[in-house]
């Protein structure tokens, strides 16, 4: 390998580690910061913080027990303890172990871009001060550096030098991470003006089929799975951008046909599908669908209206002629192994269930969502609506013992025995992840990840920032919302609809007190009146953060739409990493050279999308709209004569080249974790050695 070739490779490799922005207001336990009415009595935090009064008092007692006589050192140690309350504590403690209690201390020697050196200040202020039960003992820290005396109480006795101390506790602040400088983390918000909104979004039509779900093939190829609401899954080849091609799909040869088990009508059907992260090796995939127990003996599950949630099915009014829990929501596992020794090459699968993961009877005939997806953590997330009935009359979304109106998080890799499943009261063949927020809380169901949703319709993880888990939630009367989902978060329904209090006309299931909630309000959304003057026809469809290179003018924006095709929005976080978004409705149009003719809106020259059922994302991070009029893909703005100063026409993908996910920033991201900086340092060290060998 030539030296210049190696340097290019090294640069490209390292650039992977500088793509993602990690900071987000999030606590070290992955929960969202909560609002406190006044400044905490010990730690100087107010507003949204990661400490309540109990935690604040606990930190104060811990500090007092240290018995620090030097005022300067006491002030430093107090600030370090109180970093636990910082709204960005998840990032401050990003290398956290179960015992670690010290945030990453800003250390200017770690980065040429950092001007802070709080780590050195801590050493110089406290090195000769006795600290009982020191936070800085290496046995607690578990990082590099060997203490000279583990039983000592002074830093100078615990650590051999300032260099060793800051090697273990120091770090830098950058676009990707934050470090603790002795003060609450403050975002660089000198410029809070977002980039100019896009002049519009250009689409091309590449398929006529009407699909509800799209999942890119886990092998990273330019293929994707598309499923219809009746329950047929197709494996399709995706054409390169600018190639003039269309979806390569054979309607007569589906990947799998599940229609025999699925009950389909306007509200029911196959609502979601997910492929195991290791599908290319194990062939496992999952479907979420509805069944009718009056027509299929395999449709058996416990009713969600039961005594545990203070609900009596016999007292529910039949809905559209159906009986309570006649219809069930199901997650089932299937395999592609039976049709191919190499699952990544399988072109079809058998519709025979390998395992029933989850079954639950539905009280009414609407608001059951049903999307499933694997998160970056490898667990299966299951989105469930409030069960319907109009205004959630039984308040299921806030009921702690109900799984309705919740997002669930399940482990489908470690399946308990039948006796264990029965003992734990699970709804099927799965286990509970150890870090689920309510695993040890007897008042709430352990499957729950988040509560207070009405009908979450399409959620996604940002492929560049796994802590950004976005869900659109369909509103009742006035507001459609996008929520930034966090561990244990309560999103307000039906105490709130969007940011406003909601007042149900009747509530046989009781009410939840406003004062008992700590709601997390939407980060984006729109009023019904924005898309329909009558205020009635509106229903949000969640999308994705746009991470493709195709349209640089919407890069980094979260794109979502209204079901009725009346609007598409693009939201951008302002300032960066704040969790606050500015969103704007944008126009959409069809490329003049679209491979398939787009549908025109009656009486106009504009594009008619029909119903926007879902969004999709391929392995190149290009975004698709799955509509009743076909499959549309976001393409270069110039193909619609839209102005985008960032578009470089010379950097277009070459038609006919392989669409490899390795060209995508997210492919680099898959291999990055909390200690990515250490990996970079290691790689650089190895690179220097290799350069010496090459020369």
UniProtKB/Swiss-Prot annotation:
Its cofactor is pyrroloquinoline quinone. Pfam families: GSDH. One of its GO terms (molecular function) is oxidoreductase activity. SUPFAM superfamilies: Soluble quinoprotein glucose dehydrogenase. Residues 1-23 form the signal peptide. Belongs to the PQQ oxidoreductase GdhB family. This is HIPL1 protein.
